[in-house]
Amino acid sequence: MISRCIKRCYRSGYMIFPPNRLQSTIRSKEEINSSRHKFNIADTSVRKQYNEELVFTKDAKENAEAKKVSSKVKKDRKNHSAAMEGVNINVPGIYRDVYPLPNEDVEMHEAKKKENICKKENLSKTVLVRQLAEIYFANSNKYVVDENGLDDLIQQAFKNPNDVFQPLPSKRDGDNMRLFIETEEEADMTSIKQHAIEVVLQDFQEEQPLEDKRDTIE
């Protein structure tokens, strides 16, 4: 309606301004540009949010499908392991028995466990011998233990580990005189410790089974 009035006025050569009631509804160019800019911003924001929701929905769907497949695979593996755990042998007239299949992982674990136990015992015996040498021969300027006496001392300590820190019998105790020989030279701590360790390791290897002994030698 406004455009028609403007056209008629233009044709007649007269310029008639619309009333104030209509002038308030006409927007300026700045307002139009501002509105268009706001619309573009809002449109971009809505499209971005829609794309994010679309991607999130797609990822959630893919994750759900992946979890479903993973759970199915785990279930199938569990059922297969349960089915292959034993071999069922059905013989007419004989009670049904289940024979477990050999498990290499279990055998390797047991062998490793046995090896660790042997190493631990070996280390504990070596440490014990060093402690004995340091305790019993710390002040051995006058006496030195011969090989036979040292062997007896080691065996006695292993049989009675609670008496390791008991004082060594003196030379005047009769039966224990063979543990000592008199010398004017100072005892060689290194040689005493080394000999004690060699004795313990030799006894330890003799106590092991053939397989363990072969592994120790290698």
Swiss-Prot record:
This is Small ribosomal subunit protein mS26. Coiled coil: none annotated. The keyword Ribosomal protein applies. It comes from the Eukaryota. It comes from Schizosaccharomyces pombe (strain 972 / ATCC 24843). The keyword Mitochondrion applies. Component of the mitochondrial small ribosomal subunit (mt-SSU). Mature yeast 74S mitochondrial ribosomes consist of a small (37S) and a large (54S) subunit. The 37S small subunit contains a 15S ribosomal RNA (15S mt-rRNA) and at least 32 different proteins. The 54S large subunit contains a 21S rRNA (21S mt-rRNA) and at least 45 different proteins. It is found in: Mitochondrion. One of its GO terms (cellular component) is mitochondrion. Belongs to the mitochondrion-specific ribosomal protein mS26 family. Component of the mitochondrial ribosome (mitoribosome), a dedicated translation machinery responsible for the synthesis of mitochondrial genome-encoded proteins, including at least some of the essential transmembrane subunits of the mitochondrial respiratory chain. The mitoribosomes are attached to the mitochondrial inner membrane and translation products are cotranslationally integrated into the membrane. Disulfide bonds: none annotated. GO terms for biological process: mitochondrial translation. Keywords: Mitochondrion, Ribonucleoprotein, Ribosomal protein.
